[in-house]
Amino acid sequence: MLRWTVHLEGGPRRVNHAAVAVGHRVYSFGGYCSGEDYETLRQIDVHIFNAVSLRWTKLPPVKSAIRGQAPVVPYMRYGHSTVLIDDTVLLWGGRNDTEGACNVLYAFDVNTHKWFTPRVSGTVPGARDGHSACVLGKIMYIFGGYEQQADCFSNDIHKLDTSTMTWTLICTKGSPARWRDFHSATMLGSHMYVFGGRADRFGPFHSNNEIYCNRIRVFDTRTEAWLDCPPTPVLPEGRRSHSAFGYNGELYIFGGYNARLNRHFHDLWKFNPVSFTWKKIEPKGKGPCPRRRQCCCIVGDKIVLFGGTSPSPEEGLGDEFDLIDHSDLHILDFSPSLKTLCKLAVIQYNLDQSCLPHDIRWELNAMTTNSNISRPIVSSHG
Protein backbone atom coordinates (compact mmCIF):
# COMPACT_ATOMS: atom_id res chain seq x y z
CA MET A 1 0.00 0.00 0.00
CA LEU A 2 1.92 3.03 -1.25
CA ARG A 3 1.38 6.18 0.77
CA TRP A 4 2.83 9.68 0.82
CA THR A 5 3.77 10.08 4.48
CA VAL A 6 5.92 13.19 4.85
CA HIS A 7 5.78 16.66 3.30
CA LEU A 8 8.27 19.22 4.57
CA GLU A 9 9.27 22.66 3.32
CA GLY A 10 12.45 24.66 3.86
CA GLY A 11 15.09 22.38 2.33
CA PRO A 12 17.54 23.40 -0.40
CA ARG A 13 15.70 25.23 -3.20
CA ARG A 14 17.16 23.36 -6.15
CA VAL A 15 16.44 22.51 -9.80
CA ASN A 16 18.34 20.06 -12.05
CA HIS A 17 20.44 18.89 -9.12
CA ALA A 18 21.76 15.33 -8.67
CA ALA A 19 21.57 13.07 -5.64
CA VAL A 20 22.46 9.64 -4.26
CA ALA A 21 21.34 7.72 -1.18
CA VAL A 22 24.01 6.41 1.20
CA GLY A 23 22.46 4.38 3.99
CA HIS A 24 19.81 6.57 5.64
CA ARG A 25 21.27 9.77 4.18
CA VAL A 26 20.67 11.47 0.85
CA TYR A 27 23.50 13.57 -0.62
CA SER A 28 22.37 16.31 -3.01
CA PHE A 29 24.90 18.00 -5.28
CA GLY A 30 24.55 21.36 -6.99
CA GLY A 31 21.69 22.36 -9.24
CA TYR A 32 20.47 25.91 -9.55
CA CYS A 33 17.88 28.23 -8.09
CA SER A 34 16.34 31.19 -9.90
CA GLY A 35 17.80 34.50 -8.78
CA GLU A 36 21.12 33.17 -7.47
CA ASP A 37 24.47 34.46 -8.75
CA TYR A 38 25.82 32.03 -11.34
CA GLU A 39 28.23 34.46 -13.00
CA THR A 40 30.72 34.02 -10.16
CA LEU A 41 32.55 30.71 -10.34
CA ARG A 42 32.17 28.88 -7.04
CA GLN A 43 32.31 25.41 -5.54
CA ILE A 44 29.44 23.02 -5.97
CA ASP A 45 27.40 22.82 -2.80
CA VAL A 46 26.50 19.60 -0.99
CA HIS A 47 23.35 19.18 1.10
CA ILE A 48 22.66 16.08 3.21
CA PHE A 49 19.19 14.87 4.22
CA ASN A 50 18.94 12.51 7.18
CA ALA A 51 15.96 10.22 6.57
CA VAL A 52 15.74 9.36 10.30
CA SER A 53 15.75 12.87 11.80
CA LEU A 54 14.16 14.35 8.63
CA ARG A 55 16.65 17.25 8.80
CA TRP A 56 18.82 18.89 6.14
CA THR A 57 22.40 20.05 6.68
CA LYS A 58 24.79 21.80 4.32
CA LEU A 59 28.48 20.94 4.18
CA PRO A 60 30.87 23.89 4.59
CA PRO A 61 32.96 25.01 1.59
CA VAL A 62 36.15 23.04 1.02
CA LYS A 63 39.35 24.82 2.03
CA SER A 64 42.56 24.29 0.14
CA ALA A 65 45.28 22.27 1.82
CA ILE A 66 47.89 24.39 0.02
CA ARG A 67 47.87 28.16 0.53
CA GLY A 68 47.04 30.06 -2.64
CA GLN A 69 45.93 26.94 -4.52
CA ALA A 70 42.27 26.26 -5.25
CA PRO A 71 40.93 22.99 -3.81
CA VAL A 72 39.91 20.14 -6.12
CA VAL A 73 36.15 20.69 -6.15
CA PRO A 74 33.75 20.72 -9.12
CA TYR A 75 32.29 24.10 -9.97
CA MET A 76 28.61 24.80 -9.34
CA ARG A 77 26.54 23.23 -12.13
CA TYR A 78 23.24 21.74 -13.25
CA GLY A 79 22.24 18.86 -15.53
CA HIS A 80 25.04 16.65 -14.14
CA SER A 81 24.84 13.06 -12.89
CA THR A 82 25.90 11.28 -9.72
CA VAL A 83 26.18 7.58 -8.90
CA LEU A 84 27.41 5.69 -5.85
CA ILE A 85 30.03 2.94 -6.09
CA ASP A 86 31.14 1.58 -2.71
CA ASP A 87 31.73 4.66 -0.54
CA THR A 88 32.44 7.00 -3.44
CA VAL A 89 30.09 9.30 -5.32
CA LEU A 90 31.09 9.80 -8.95
CA LEU A 91 29.95 13.13 -10.39
CA TRP A 92 30.16 13.65 -14.13
CA GLY A 93 29.01 16.19 -16.71
CA GLY A 94 26.68 19.11 -16.25
CA ARG A 95 27.20 22.75 -17.08
CA ASN A 96 26.89 26.30 -15.85
CA ASP A 97 26.40 29.57 -17.69
CA THR A 98 29.99 30.76 -17.20
CA GLU A 99 32.15 27.69 -17.82
CA GLY A 100 29.78 25.74 -20.08
CA ALA A 101 29.68 21.95 -19.98
CA CYS A 102 32.26 19.70 -18.31
CA ASN A 103 33.59 16.18 -18.88
CA VAL A 104 35.96 15.91 -15.91
CA LEU A 105 35.21 13.01 -13.56
CA TYR A 106 35.02 14.01 -9.90
CA ALA A 107 34.86 11.66 -6.92
CA PHE A 108 33.48 12.43 -3.46
CA ASP A 109 34.32 10.25 -0.46
CA VAL A 110 31.19 10.00 1.71
CA ASN A 111 33.26 9.12 4.79
CA THR A 112 35.74 12.00 4.65
CA HIS A 113 33.66 14.45 2.56
CA LYS A 114 36.73 15.06 0.40
CA TRP A 115 36.78 15.56 -3.38
CA PHE A 116 39.38 14.18 -5.78
CA THR A 117 39.75 13.67 -9.52
CA PRO A 118 40.53 10.05 -10.43
CA ARG A 119 43.04 9.48 -13.20
CA VAL A 120 41.14 8.07 -16.20
CA SER A 121 42.06 6.69 -19.61
CA GLY A 122 40.27 5.60 -22.76
CA THR A 123 37.61 7.39 -24.81
CA VAL A 124 36.28 10.10 -22.53
CA PRO A 125 32.75 11.28 -23.45
CA GLY A 126 32.40 14.82 -24.72
CA ALA A 127 31.25 17.47 -22.26
CA ARG A 128 27.46 17.53 -21.95
CA ASP A 129 24.46 17.98 -19.71
CA GLY A 130 21.06 16.31 -19.52
CA HIS A 131 22.54 12.81 -19.86
CA SER A 132 21.78 9.81 -17.65
CA ALA A 133 24.07 7.68 -15.51
CA CYS A 134 23.44 4.30 -13.92
CA VAL A 135 25.56 1.56 -12.40
CA LEU A 136 25.93 -2.18 -12.78
CA GLY A 137 28.54 -3.58 -10.41
CA LYS A 138 31.69 -1.51 -10.84
CA ILE A 139 30.67 -0.03 -14.20
CA MET A 140 28.98 3.33 -14.76
CA TYR A 141 26.99 3.78 -17.97
CA ILE A 142 26.46 7.24 -19.49
CA PHE A 143 23.75 7.65 -22.14
CA GLY A 144 22.57 10.59 -24.24
CA GLY A 145 22.53 14.22 -23.19
CA TYR A 146 23.30 17.39 -25.14
CA GLU A 147 26.93 17.60 -26.26
CA GLN A 148 28.45 21.07 -26.07
CA GLN A 149 31.20 20.83 -28.70
CA ALA A 150 29.10 18.99 -31.29
CA ASP A 151 26.09 21.17 -30.39
CA CYS A 152 23.69 18.26 -30.72
CA PHE A 153 21.77 15.59 -28.87
CA SER A 154 23.58 12.29 -28.26
CA ASN A 155 22.50 8.66 -28.31
CA ASP A 156 25.92 7.22 -27.52
CA ILE A 157 26.59 4.93 -24.58
CA HIS A 158 29.91 5.26 -22.77
CA LYS A 159 30.94 3.08 -19.87
CA LEU A 160 33.50 3.69 -17.16
CA ASP A 161 35.04 0.60 -15.59
CA THR A 162 35.90 1.90 -12.13
CA SER A 163 38.19 -1.05 -11.41
CA THR A 164 40.58 0.26 -14.09
CA MET A 165 39.20 3.81 -14.48
CA THR A 166 38.92 3.24 -18.23
CA TRP A 167 36.32 4.91 -20.43
CA THR A 168 34.94 3.01 -23.45
CA LEU A 169 32.57 4.14 -26.19
CA ILE A 170 30.30 1.13 -26.71
CA CYS A 171 29.71 0.09 -30.31
CA THR A 172 26.13 -0.97 -29.74
CA LYS A 173 24.20 -3.51 -31.78
CA GLY A 174 20.56 -3.29 -32.78
CA SER A 175 18.44 -0.23 -33.48
CA PRO A 176 19.60 2.46 -31.03
CA ALA A 177 17.39 4.71 -28.96
CA ARG A 178 16.80 8.15 -30.42
CA TRP A 179 19.09 11.08 -29.60
CA ARG A 180 17.78 12.82 -26.48
CA ASP A 181 18.44 14.69 -23.26
CA PHE A 182 16.78 14.92 -19.83
CA HIS A 183 15.50 11.35 -20.09
CA SER A 184 15.91 8.64 -17.45
CA ALA A 185 17.93 5.42 -17.52
CA THR A 186 17.36 2.81 -14.83
CA MET A 187 19.26 -0.44 -14.34
CA LEU A 188 17.13 -3.51 -13.60
CA GLY A 189 19.29 -6.61 -13.52
CA SER A 190 21.67 -6.38 -16.48
CA HIS A 191 19.27 -4.30 -18.59
CA MET A 192 19.19 -0.50 -18.83
CA TYR A 193 15.68 0.91 -19.32
CA VAL A 194 15.54 4.30 -21.04
CA PHE A 195 12.37 6.36 -20.92
CA GLY A 196 11.32 9.80 -22.12
CA GLY A 197 13.50 12.82 -22.62
CA ARG A 198 13.49 15.57 -25.22
CA ALA A 199 14.31 14.57 -28.79
CA ASP A 200 14.01 16.44 -32.10
CA ARG A 201 12.42 15.68 -35.45
CA PHE A 202 15.77 16.54 -37.07
CA GLY A 203 17.55 13.71 -35.26
CA PRO A 204 20.58 14.87 -33.30
CA PHE A 205 20.16 18.54 -34.18
CA HIS A 206 18.13 20.98 -32.13
CA SER A 207 15.50 22.76 -34.25
CA ASN A 208 12.79 23.39 -31.63
CA ASN A 209 10.71 20.66 -33.29
CA GLU A 210 10.64 18.62 -30.12
CA ILE A 211 9.59 14.99 -29.80
CA TYR A 212 8.55 13.37 -26.53
CA CYS A 213 8.70 9.63 -27.10
CA ASN A 214 6.82 7.47 -24.60
CA ARG A 215 8.18 4.11 -25.78
CA ILE A 216 10.55 2.43 -23.39
CA ARG A 217 13.90 1.33 -24.83
CA VAL A 218 16.01 -1.47 -23.38
CA PHE A 219 19.79 -1.92 -23.61
CA ASP A 220 21.29 -5.30 -22.70
CA THR A 221 24.67 -4.67 -21.05
CA ARG A 222 25.75 -8.31 -21.54
CA THR A 223 25.36 -8.33 -25.33
CA GLU A 224 25.73 -4.53 -25.68
CA ALA A 225 22.66 -4.53 -27.90
CA TRP A 226 19.49 -2.45 -28.04
CA LEU A 227 16.59 -4.87 -27.86
CA ASP A 228 13.48 -5.02 -30.01
CA CYS A 229 10.63 -4.40 -27.60
CA PRO A 230 7.00 -5.48 -27.91
CA PRO A 231 4.24 -2.84 -28.06
CA THR A 232 2.62 -1.80 -24.81
CA PRO A 233 -1.16 -1.17 -24.75
CA VAL A 234 -1.13 1.54 -22.04
CA LEU A 235 1.56 4.21 -21.94
CA PRO A 236 2.39 7.30 -19.89
CA GLU A 237 2.61 10.58 -21.79
CA GLY A 238 6.07 11.33 -23.13
CA ARG A 239 8.01 13.72 -20.93
CA ARG A 240 11.39 15.10 -19.94
CA SER A 241 13.00 15.99 -16.61
CA HIS A 242 10.99 13.36 -14.74
CA SER A 243 12.22 11.04 -11.98
CA ALA A 244 12.75 7.30 -12.38
CA PHE A 245 13.75 4.56 -9.96
CA GLY A 246 13.76 0.80 -9.68
CA TYR A 247 12.06 -1.02 -6.81
CA ASN A 248 11.57 -4.79 -6.43
CA GLY A 249 12.52 -5.41 -10.04
CA GLU A 250 10.07 -2.86 -11.48
CA LEU A 251 10.55 0.62 -12.92
CA TYR A 252 8.69 3.68 -11.63
CA ILE A 253 8.49 7.18 -13.10
CA PHE A 254 7.13 10.36 -11.55
CA GLY A 255 6.36 13.85 -12.86
CA GLY A 256 8.14 15.65 -15.68
CA TYR A 257 7.17 18.05 -18.46
CA ASN A 258 5.98 17.87 -22.07
CA ALA A 259 6.45 21.11 -24.03
CA ARG A 260 4.25 20.00 -26.92
CA LEU A 261 1.38 19.46 -24.50
CA ASN A 262 2.52 22.46 -22.43
CA ARG A 263 1.98 20.35 -19.35
CA HIS A 264 3.70 19.44 -16.09
CA PHE A 265 2.93 16.07 -14.50
CA HIS A 266 2.63 14.64 -10.99
CA ASP A 267 1.54 11.14 -11.93
CA LEU A 268 3.24 7.91 -10.82
CA TRP A 269 3.58 4.98 -13.24
CA LYS A 270 4.96 1.45 -12.77
CA PHE A 271 6.55 -0.61 -15.54
CA ASN A 272 6.87 -4.39 -15.27
CA PRO A 273 9.79 -5.64 -17.41
CA VAL A 274 8.48 -9.23 -17.47
CA SER A 275 5.00 -8.51 -18.83
CA PHE A 276 6.25 -5.32 -20.52
CA THR A 277 3.25 -3.37 -19.27
CA TRP A 278 2.67 0.01 -17.65
CA LYS A 279 0.22 0.69 -14.82
CA LYS A 280 -0.72 4.03 -13.32
CA ILE A 281 -0.34 4.00 -9.54
CA GLU A 282 -2.47 6.07 -7.16
CA PRO A 283 -0.73 6.29 -3.76
CA LYS A 284 -2.67 7.27 -0.65
CA GLY A 285 -2.02 10.64 0.95
CA LYS A 286 -1.17 14.05 -0.46
CA GLY A 287 1.70 13.92 -2.96
CA PRO A 288 3.82 16.58 -4.67
CA CYS A 289 2.30 19.14 -7.02
CA PRO A 290 3.05 18.82 -10.78
CA ARG A 291 6.75 19.48 -11.40
CA ARG A 292 9.91 18.68 -13.31
CA ARG A 293 13.68 18.69 -12.63
CA GLN A 294 13.28 17.20 -9.14
CA CYS A 295 15.49 14.54 -7.54
CA CYS A 296 14.39 11.16 -6.28
CA CYS A 297 16.32 8.57 -4.19
CA ILE A 298 15.47 5.22 -2.61
CA VAL A 299 16.11 4.81 1.13
CA GLY A 300 15.02 1.33 2.18
CA ASP A 301 11.33 1.01 1.32
CA LYS A 302 10.91 4.76 0.98
CA ILE A 303 11.31 7.21 -1.88
CA VAL A 304 12.69 10.63 -0.99
CA LEU A 305 11.68 13.22 -3.59
CA PHE A 306 12.72 16.86 -3.34
CA GLY A 307 13.10 20.09 -5.25
CA GLY A 308 12.22 20.78 -8.85
CA THR A 309 10.18 23.53 -10.48
CA SER A 310 6.49 24.10 -11.25
CA PRO A 311 4.37 26.74 -12.95
CA SER A 312 3.29 29.62 -10.76
CA PRO A 313 -0.23 28.90 -9.42
CA GLU A 314 -1.46 31.99 -11.27
CA GLU A 315 -0.17 30.64 -14.59
CA GLY A 316 -1.74 27.16 -14.66
CA LEU A 317 0.09 23.88 -15.21
CA GLY A 318 1.97 24.55 -18.41
CA ASP A 319 3.33 28.06 -18.75
CA GLU A 320 7.06 27.96 -19.50
CA PHE A 321 7.72 31.55 -18.50
CA ASP A 322 6.76 31.80 -14.85
CA LEU A 323 8.17 28.93 -12.82
CA ILE A 324 8.50 28.53 -9.06
CA ASP A 325 11.49 26.57 -7.73
CA HIS A 326 10.72 24.25 -4.82
CA SER A 327 12.39 23.73 -1.44
CA ASP A 328 10.02 20.95 -0.40
CA LEU A 329 10.57 17.25 0.29
CA HIS A 330 8.14 14.35 0.06
CA ILE A 331 8.47 10.73 1.21
CA LEU A 332 6.62 7.90 -0.50
CA ASP A 333 6.49 4.76 1.65
CA PHE A 334 6.06 1.46 -0.18
CA SER A 335 5.27 -0.42 3.02
CA PRO A 336 4.13 1.95 5.78
CA SER A 337 4.17 0.28 9.19
CA LEU A 338 1.27 0.34 11.62
CA LYS A 339 3.35 2.74 13.70
CA THR A 340 3.66 5.12 10.74
CA LEU A 341 -0.07 4.93 10.02
CA CYS A 342 -0.84 5.70 13.66
CA LYS A 343 1.47 8.73 13.62
CA LEU A 344 -0.25 9.99 10.47
CA ALA A 345 -3.61 9.64 12.24
CA VAL A 346 -2.32 11.65 15.22
CA ILE A 347 -1.20 14.40 12.83
CA GLN A 348 -4.33 14.34 10.68
CA TYR A 349 -6.79 14.50 13.58
CA ASN A 350 -4.60 16.70 15.82
CA LEU A 351 -4.80 14.19 18.67
CA ASP A 352 -3.38 14.81 22.14
CA GLN A 353 0.28 13.72 22.28
CA SER A 354 0.98 14.27 25.97
CA CYS A 355 0.49 10.61 26.87
CA LEU A 356 2.77 9.34 24.11
CA PRO A 357 6.37 8.15 24.70
CA HIS A 358 9.09 10.75 24.21
CA ASP A 359 10.53 9.06 21.11
CA ILE A 360 7.12 9.03 19.40
CA ARG A 361 6.60 12.72 20.18
CA TRP A 362 10.09 13.43 18.78
CA GLU A 363 9.21 11.58 15.57
CA LEU A 364 5.90 13.42 15.25
CA ASN A 365 7.71 16.72 15.71
CA ALA A 366 10.22 15.80 12.99
CA MET A 367 7.39 14.87 10.60
CA THR A 368 5.69 18.24 11.05
CA THR A 369 8.56 20.71 11.49
CA ASN A 370 9.90 22.31 8.33
CA SER A 371 13.61 22.78 7.66
CA ASN A 372 15.03 26.30 7.55
CA ILE A 373 17.91 26.30 5.09
CA SER A 374 16.14 27.39 1.89
CA ARG A 375 16.59 30.85 0.39
CA PRO A 376 13.63 33.16 -0.39
CA ILE A 377 11.53 32.20 -3.38
CA VAL A 378 12.15 33.88 -6.75
CA SER A 379 10.18 33.36 -9.95
CA SER A 380 12.00 32.09 -13.05
CA HIS A 381 11.24 33.86 -16.32
CA GLY A 382 12.34 32.14 -19.52
UniProtKB/Swiss-Prot annotation:
GO BP term, pick one: proteasome-mediated ubiquitin-dependent protein catabolic process
Pathway: Protein modification; protein ubiquitination
Keyword annotations from UniProtKB, A to Z: Cytoplasm, Kelch repeat, Meiosis, Repeat, Ubl conjugation pathway
Xref: Pfam families: Kelch_6 (PF13964), Kelch_KLHDC2_KLHL20_DRC7 (PF24681)
GO cellular component: chromatin; Cul2-RING ubiquitin ligase complex; cytoplasm; cytosol; nucleoplasm
Free-text function comment from the UniProt entry: Substrate-recognition component of a Cul2-RING (CRL2) E3 ubiquitin-protein ligase complex of the DesCEND (destruction via C-end degrons) pathway, which recognizes a C-degron located at the extreme C terminus of target proteins, leading to their ubiquitination and degradation. The C-degron recognized by the DesCEND pathway is usually a motif of less than ten residues and can be present in full-length proteins, truncated proteins or proteolytically cleaved forms.
Protein name: Kelch domain-containing protein 3
